């Protein structure tokens, strides 16, 4: 614990490494994102990380969480960044803060606010007057929140990042210097650093004078550190993101990495004298609509709700094998750990819940949204919306015996209805797909419901506007004159439920459950297809029969003693019950995305961890022929098209030797 009146902390560097208050210091840190953890559980998760032996925690700052609309800022409750940092400091932990403004993080739009994209001419992450004006206005608010927490003022913040992995995107040094100078001018006096993949191209694009150069990688520690030493000839070697785990896209297996292998690399880094940030220490959850997405040039790849990341502290606070092995290694290098982890929070007993209320989304449109009128079907951002669904309606003229309906610039997934009947599904990965339409003499009402499945958070396709970007055509004729209804679905209190079942199409379904003592639980939806779940008004996240995720984590603080309400928005066909589980494992075995059967739970591919179909790429992303004998070993790829902005990857060939960089191949996703 820190004293009630702590002394200033200084983190500096000399030729050999870090100095903390003048003494040699090795940073052993764990990443935890406050915006992925319920605030009532911040202390629990931080205590678990402290018990693993780390002396520091690291967090990104998600701009879009704090400024959901231009000029409207929130730093209360789940957005109380200062409270999170103070709490870490009270537990005796130093804090590294990475304010971006771009953070990647598998978070919607890499943490940038969606409203930036309302201006179709804005240019992101470079010296663009409109973008920099928004960033400067944000930093004018953010830095005063963080300044009192700096180590020089007795707070726990010892270092801050400048942008994030910028060399994987661009090389505008003037932009990075603008961010650096902006932090300094606003009073940030702690150590500053940039971080990029441990490849020459990345480092050349992302480093700037006067700022510590650090790396991100998950394999080949000796080679990675050697590359880092080229760009940081003296001073500390730092792996700001040690990728011991990985995130998941819908339709993939859950990614895991052998704990012994992950521990061996951590041991190698610490033995080399490097400072390390374990990414992630605790992954948490992409609650609500906040998940990010990748794009590999051919396939859009949205992330699942869980951000478990195969971390040492699991999504619900579990202490995994990695936790215990990492603790042993950290203890060996830095000394005994003085703290033990708290007991695992209690969990609710399993039960099956019947539905007691239903209402269709179409019948609720006017209760959930205010209608806008536009000539063209504008994007979400142009309609003043960032997250959720958006509904478009127009009147088609008839008679038209046969026509093909196309959506130009769809992002991401559209259900199409003619006079209230669903006629098909369109997705962004099939931009040339069309639906056959017959319009009767009197015309027909066309409804299009589009889901934003998560903005791309990495690569050249970052400007990922949602909804309908260009237009809707019948054959070659664009349709004009649209009613547009933004559906952020952040308040469902106006819904009017009835007992009459709604068995098909987008609809809300309700169940009520009595709870004696609030506790953690997992929500399973057997027989349901795709949608979103709310608990007592809080959006838990998306579900999708595609997997790999089969349950949603419902933290104990969201429950209350007495009556609790679960609302499920099902976009297609609902199940008949909702299951409360005491484990993330579903009640029954589900088909894997490939059609094979797999054991229940989310560690579905332990025999071949990270096997997602890879090929190698050199430093410039040029892929040689694929080799079918390799499985992924330790990866972190955020994809882009027209340029391969791959980060450092490691593969293990079946003979056990490591290979060079790689990138994930396109993975087609069925419905």
Positions of the model-derived regions?
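Aromatic- and acidic-residue-enriched segments that line the glycan-binding/catalytic groove
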Residues: 71-77, 101-125, 176, 210-213, ...
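An active-site-proximal structural segment forming one wall of the substrate-binding cleft
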Residues: 81-91, 95-97, 121-156
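Active-site neighborhood of glycoside hydrolase catalytic domains
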Residues: 133-208
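Catalytic-core region of carbohydrate-active enzymes that cleave or remodel glycosidic bonds
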Residues: 218-314, 318, 329
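The substrate-binding groove and active-site-proximal loops of carbohydrate-active enzymes
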Residues: 27-38, 63-79, 117-137, 161-172, ...
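N-terminal carbohydrate-binding accessory modules
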Residues: 1-56
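Aromatic-lined substrate-binding rim segments of carbohydrate-active enzymes
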Residues: 43-107, 180, 184
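Aromatic-lined ligand-binding clefts that engage carbohydrates, nucleic acids, or primary amines
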Residues: 402-417, 446, 513-536, 543-544, ...
